[in-house]
UniProtKB/Swiss-Prot annotation:
Gene: SURF4
Protein name in the entry: Surfeit locus protein 4
The keyword Membrane belongs to this UniProt entry's keyword annotation: yes
Chain's role: Endoplasmic reticulum cargo receptor that mediates the export of lipoproteins by recruiting cargos into COPII vesicles to facilitate their secretion. Acts as a cargo receptor for lipoproteins bearing both APOB and APOA1, thereby regulating lipoprotein delivery and the maintenance of lipid homeostasis. Synergizes with the GTPase SAR1B to mediate transport of circulating lipoproteins. Promotes the secretion of PCSK9. Also mediates the efficient secretion of erythropoietin (EPO).
Superkingdom to which the source organism belongs: Eukaryota
Record key words, sorted: Endoplasmic reticulum, Golgi apparatus, Membrane, Protein transport, Transmembrane, Transmembrane helix, Transport
Amino acid sequence: MGQNDLMGTAEDFADQFLRVTKQYLPHVARLCLISTFLEDGIRMWFQWSEQRDYIDTTWNCGYLLASSFVFLNLLGQLTGCVLVLSRNFVQYACFGLFGIIALQTIAYSILWDLKFLMRNLALGGGLLLLLAESRSEGKSMFAGVPTMRESSPKQYMQLGGRVLLVLMFMTLLHFDASFFSIVQNIVGTALMILVAIGFKTKLAALTLVVWLFAINVYFNAFWTIPVYKPMHDFLKYDFFQTMSVIGGLLLVVALGPGGVSMDEKKKEW
């Protein structure tokens, strides 16, 4: 009974949190989700020559192609962010940002770095959830019209988004024998599984948001590193990418897990 009471109290707290924040939580989620694209687009502007020279040196593609790559990244990311925040052409913005992720994965050789690849996939999961949200908003004007068959892609996008989001947490697992690491791995893995299968989803996602935010502020405190040091840019990139995954989790909290989840199946039982 003690465990049931504790779980019930936690779920009541999560429900109360949602009631208080439901008006602005989706907006905060979107801002967090696109923050890494916004930061990267601004960085492309201020580090234009460095980014161009890096691409030119890595791929030996010449000044013109390297400059075109940087310009495409800058324009694509900033335009996508503006469209998402203004809720205009959100689906096109998501597809454009998907393209940016794929382009950067190849250009910066992220494909061969498992940790960064998993984080990019997690970022793609957040965009999938945003795409699912935009589809539901687009259909809201037809409330009352049967759309069971049409809503199916949205449900599977939510499932795919949830599964991809948990990849971020797999990069945070520590494989050492310390007591703290073992406890953190067990709790984190349990929460990841709950989010992926959609069981107690909002509570698990909200708990992961708090946990990931604390880890992010502690380990990626780029503001404590002088701007001229390379570690500053590395931590800043990591910080905002993690914030984007937090945004995806906040969308899960705000919108729920979708139809393909244990929470929804329980209602049918």
